[in-house]
C-alpha cells in the first residue's frame, strides 16, 4: 500500500476556514502535519458583520487534536496581512486555498451596484490579493500549491446568480494563467467547483441534500491537489458526495463561411449553422495557441476550396509596392559547414536512437554505412531564416513576432555528404496576399562547388500583414497534397523526451520559444514548444524507415504543412499512405489526436534504380584492383600471414559518402582468403575508408594511424588489429 499523504512542515493558508468547506480543509491539513493559518472574517454568508469566534473555534479544535494553527481575522481583500500572519508565525507559505466567499443572490434586474461589487471583491479580487501576496515567496522557494474555488454557477450559469457566476468564472481564468506562469517555478494552480453543504448553500438546497453533500467529501481532493507529489496543473474539477470529475473545453471543427468574390453574410452563417455546431468530430484545445494556431490551416483550406478573404470595411488596401518589390530579392550568400558531429547531433534531435539498430547508421560515425539524415538539408539552409535575415529585405516591414512557419519543402539531388561545406543562395521567390496575412515564399539552393546538392522552400505566414491587393496563388509555391481518404497503410509512433527541444536546438535553431518558459508564456504557450522542423524530422525518419529501409539514396523530396504545436514529452504518430513512389503522411500527437503536420508527402526514388555496389558516378573502384592483387600475392605467403594476423578484416569502401563496396580479408584459417562482400562469419575488425584514401594508404602517402586519428579511416570491433594493416599491405602483399 502506498504511503499516506503528509504535509509535515508545510504552511497552509485556508481562507474562509471558520466553517463549512474551509473548516474541513483546515482540519484535514492539520491532521496530516500541516501548519495551518485559519482565516475567517467572521461575518454571515452575505458578507455582513465580522468577528473572531469562527476562526478561533477551528484553531482550538486543531490544537486539541495535537495540531498547530493560528487564526487570522482579516478580509481577503487585505491579502498581504493574511500572508504576513503565515510568515511571522511559521516563516514561509507553501499552500494557499482560496475558499472565502459570500452570496448576494438577486435576479439580474434587481442586482445593485453594491451586490455586484462586493461579490467580485470577495471572490475574484480576494483570490487575486491573497495569491499575489504569496506568489513571490513561492517563486523564491521554487515551490507552491494554489487552489481556486469556482462553482457550477460559474461554469454553467444559474438563475439569480449573475454576479456570483461572473466572479466564479473569472477565478477560473485567473487560475489558468497562473498555472502557465507558475509552472517554471514549481507553482501549481488548480480550480475546483465543489458541491457541498455550507452557510451559503444551506439557503438554496434542501436540508437532506445539504447533509449528503458533506464538506468531508470535498476535502480529500483539495489535499491531493495541494500535495507536493501531485503534478496536476491548470485543471478544473467538479466534486461532491464522493464523486470527482475533470472538465475540459471542447470545440467543433466548425465551418468556413467565406465565398470567393462575395461578401461574408449572416445568411452564410445560418446555412452552415448545423456544421458549426456539430460536435461529432470535436477538438479539445488546451492552450491559447492551440485555439488560434489553426488559422494557417484554415487559410490553406480557403485557398484549396476556392474561397477568398473579403474585407470587412471599405478601407483602402495597403500600398502594394513594399511587399511586391521584395519579390526576386537575393539575400547575401552564405556557407554552411558541418562535421559528422553536427549530423549525429541532428539525428539524435529528431529521435534517432541506439535502441533501434537501424538508426545506428545515423548516430555512429564508425558505422559501415554512416549517413546524414536527408532532412538535415533544412539545417544547412536555415541560416537564411536566422539572425534577422528577412529583416534586411527591402520592402519587408512587419512584426516578426507574428511570423509562423507555415510550410516546408526539401528536395535532394544526391545524398548529403557525411561532412562538408555547402554554399547557400537564398531568394524571395514570391509573396502572397491571404487577406488576414501574407505568405513569404523563400527558395534556398545549396551547392557543393558548382554541384546543386539540395533545394529548400520556406513558406512563412505573417499574421495581420495581408490585404495589400497582391496575388493569392503562385506557381512557384510547392503544393501541399491532401492525404488519401482511407485508413493508413502504416503507422509509426515515437515518444519525444522532455529534453527534445533542448537537444534539437543544438542544431542551430536558437529561438527562445523552444527553451525559455517566460518567452513561451508571452507567446501564449503554457510551456516551451517543440520546433516544427523537429517534428518534420521525426516524420521523415518514420517514412524512410517504413518504406525505404533507411536507405538515404532513395529519398528525393518532402513537403509538409505545419498545423499545430507539439510539447516535448508528447508522442508523435506518423500515419502513412503509399501511392507509387509517393508516401503521403500526416503526423498527430498520439495523446490528443491533434494533427500537427498535414497535407504532407515524401517522394522516393524507385528501389530498382538504386545500386548498392557501384558509386553514383559510375566506373570501377580503384580499390577493387588492389584487393584482387592482395588475394593473388597472399597465395604464396598466406599461412605465414595467418599465423601473425589471426584475424578477419572486413572493409567498407565508400564513394561520395556512401558505401560502394565491401571486401573481406580472412587471415584466420588455412592460407587465408580474400573475397568481395561482407565476412562469411563475424569480422574481428571492420574498417571504413574512402576509395581515394585507401589508395593513399596503399601507396604510402597516408599513414593508417594518422588516418584513424584524423577521422579519414574508421574502425569498429578490435580496432587494435588495424595496426597490422602495414604488415598486410607492405610486408606481405608487397604493395
From Swiss-Prot:
A motif (Microbody targeting signal) lies at residues 733-735. Residues 483-599 form the MaoC-like domain. It comes from Mus musculus. Substrate binds at residues 151, 705, 723. Its EC number is 1.1.1.n12, 4.2.1.107, 4.2.1.119. The modification N6-acetyllysine is found at residues 46, 564, 668, 706. Bifunctional enzyme acting on the peroxisomal fatty acid beta-oxidation pathway. Catalyzes two of the four reactions in fatty acid degradation: hydration of 2-enoyl-CoA (trans-2-enoyl-CoA) to produce (3R)-3-hydroxyacyl-CoA, and dehydrogenation of (3R)-3-hydroxyacyl-CoA to produce 3-ketoacyl-CoA (3-oxoacyl-CoA), which is further metabolized by SCPx. Can use straight-chain and branched-chain fatty acids, as well as bile acid intermediates as substrates. Residues 623-735 form the SCP2 domain. The modification Phosphoserine is found at residues 52, 304, 308. It is found in: Peroxisome. Pathway: Lipid metabolism; fatty acid beta-oxidation. This is Peroxisomal multifunctional enzyme type 2.
